[in-house]
């Protein structure tokens, strides 16, 4: 029997070298404690770095090639695997990922605050959420 939980895992979708490049960019920004947004730099108070990587004309691209590769891989995995399993998504309105944040969580840490994935007008049309884990399983 096929399970339809909506939660899927696609191991090794992104190559190790690509993940290392994202970590390198994260570490540079974390060291400087800055977060880029569309119009300015902001001092970041936690361990989350927001890259406004949405693939649209009006938003800032921190590193175009890094972002473009991320969204191409995400799109390929989504259309070739996820949508094939969840056929109802083929009948939904056109949708695309918007923005990306990177957060470093040490072993036994995580995002434990209650939250909603469609909490405001900016996220109210969200169709799905995705996560890319950059650590090895042994790291926790």
Model-identified regions with their sequence ranges:
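Fe(II)/2-oxoglutarate oxygenase catalytic core
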Residues: 1-140
């Amino acid at each position: 029997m096929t399970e339809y939980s909506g939660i899927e895992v696609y191991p090794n979708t992104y190559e190790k070298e690509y993940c290392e490049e994202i970590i390198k960019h994260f570490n540079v920004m974390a060291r400087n404690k800055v977060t880029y947004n569309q119009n300015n730099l902001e001092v970041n108070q936690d361990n989350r770095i927001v890259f406004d990587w949405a693939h649209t004309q009006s938003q800032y691209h921190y590193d175009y090639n890094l972002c473009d590769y991320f969204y191409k891989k995400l799109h390929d995995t989504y259309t070739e695997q996820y949508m094939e399993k969840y056929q109802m998504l083929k009948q939904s309105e056109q949708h695309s990922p918007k923005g990306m944040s990177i957060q470093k969580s040490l072993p036994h840490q995580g995002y434990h605050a209650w939250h909603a994935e469609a909490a405001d007008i900016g996220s109210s049309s969200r169709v799905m959420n995705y996560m890319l884990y950059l650590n090895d399983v042994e790291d926790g």
